[in-house]
């Protein structure tokens, strides 16, 4: 059968030696391509694959770092909000304390002024009473001297008392 195939191939105008030569040349070409073309191309592809894998790893690493930074920023923001809340609470408490201090100082000043006013009123009252006593004493002396100057009847005594009351009323 192999011989009949050769005749069929020969009748068709195909030469078996040419096919064998082309097959050997193709294998040599394939070996040369493997050594000089496919090897370097595969090396370049391998390097490219490693480079891309490295880039992916680097991107994932940077993504993780970015997530960490975002989380850190959130934590810092949370702490800042807490600090602001504490500061606001302290400021409110400080303002409340200051208000109470000012109110207490105002009350003390009011009490002091009230006490000073009472003391001044008391002094003026004492001075008025003392002045009135002096006037009463001098009027008493005056009346006594008038009584001594003349002896009075009951009518004269009543008249003298009414005059004295009028003088005391006028002095006031």
From Swiss-Prot:
Gene3D superfamilies linked: F1F0 ATP synthase subunit B, membrane domain
Keywords: ATP synthesis, Cell membrane, CF(0), Hydrogen ion transport, Ion transport, Membrane, Transmembrane, Transmembrane helix, Transport
GO cellular component, one term: proton-transporting ATP synthase complex
Membrane topology annotation: Single-pass membrane protein
Transmembrane regions listed in the UniProt entry: 13-33
Annotated localization: Cell membrane
An example molecular function term from Gene Ontology annotations: proton-transporting ATP synthase activity, rotational mechanism
Record carries keyword Protease: no
UniProt record similarity statement: Belongs to the ATPase B chain family.
Subunit structure: F-type ATPases have 2 components, F(1) - the catalytic core - and F(0) - the membrane proton channel. F(1) has five subunits: alpha(3), beta(3), gamma(1), delta(1), epsilon(1). F(0) has three main subunits: a(1), b(2) and c(10-14). The alpha and beta chains form an alternating ring which encloses part of the gamma chain. F(1) is attached to F(0) by a central stalk formed by the gamma and epsilon chains, while a peripheral stalk is formed by the delta and b chains.
NCBIfam families listed in its UniProt record: ATP_synt_b, PRK13453.1
Biological role stated in the UniProt entry: F(1)F(0) ATP synthase produces ATP from ADP in the presence of a proton or sodium gradient. F-type ATPases consist of two structural domains, F(1) containing the extramembraneous catalytic core and F(0) containing the membrane proton channel, linked together by a central stalk and a peripheral stalk. During catalysis, ATP synthesis in the catalytic domain of F(1) is coupled via a rotary mechanism of the central stalk subunits to proton translocation. Component of the F(0) channel, it forms part of the peripheral stalk, linking F(1) to F(0).
Protein name: ATP synthase subunit b
Species in which this protein is naturally found: Priestia megaterium (strain ATCC 12872 / QMB1551)
Gene: atpF
